[in-house]
Amino acid sequence: MKILVVNKKLHFNYEVLEKIEAGIELKGVEVKSIHLNNANISDSYVIFKRNEAYILNMNIAPYSHGNIYNVDPLRTRKLLLHKNEIIKYQMRIKKESLTMVPSKIYWRKNKLKVEIALAKGKKQFDKRQTIKDRDNSREARKHIRV
């Protein structure tokens, strides 16, 4: 499993409850561009329409050696999930007011996969508390070493 793109803002902005693996429907030049690490998933999220899952705001830069087949970098891309998974997560998102955010893109058995995190958004004071906890643990480790 080779990880290509990681959402570094995920654990700062969200509290992750569960992670799901999904396939993604891409064009050929998009796959080549992702392989060159020319993708950004930090602002992207998942929506459901007509019992299908789509990922929005996933920025895949145009392939440098591409031609007329280059597509819109921010186009909506379909996620490949089983129907029962879609229904299950759709109901859970509505009931618990959660969101689905991509956490990383990687290769698995010569296919690109997206790991999607079922998460709850953090408030501003939660983010501040996370920073304080991280600084306190860093200080504690520093004192242990000395």
From Swiss-Prot:
Stated role: Required for rescue of stalled ribosomes mediated by trans-translation. Binds to transfer-messenger RNA (tmRNA), required for stable association of tmRNA with ribosomes. tmRNA and SmpB together mimic tRNA shape, replacing the anticodon stem-loop with SmpB. tmRNA is encoded by the ssrA gene; the 2 termini fold to resemble tRNA(Ala) and it encodes a 'tag peptide', a short internal open reading frame. During trans-translation Ala-aminoacylated tmRNA acts like a tRNA, entering the A-site of stalled ribosomes, displacing the stalled mRNA.
Biased composition (Basic and acidic residues): 127-139
Gene Ontology cellular-component annotations: cytosol
Compartment annotation: Cytoplasm
Organism of origin: Malacoplasma penetrans (strain HF-2)
Key words of the record: Cytoplasm, RNA-binding
GO BP field: trans-translation
GO MF, one annotated term: RNA binding
UniProt xrefs under HAMAP family: SmpB
InterPro entries membership: SmpB, SsrA-bd_prot, SsrA-bd_prot_CS
Family: Belongs to the SmpB family.
Superkingdom of the source species: Bacteria
Residue ranges of the region described as Disordered: 127-146
CDD domains attached to this UniProt entry: SmpB
Identification of the protein by name: SsrA-binding protein
UniProt xrefs under Pfam families: SmpB
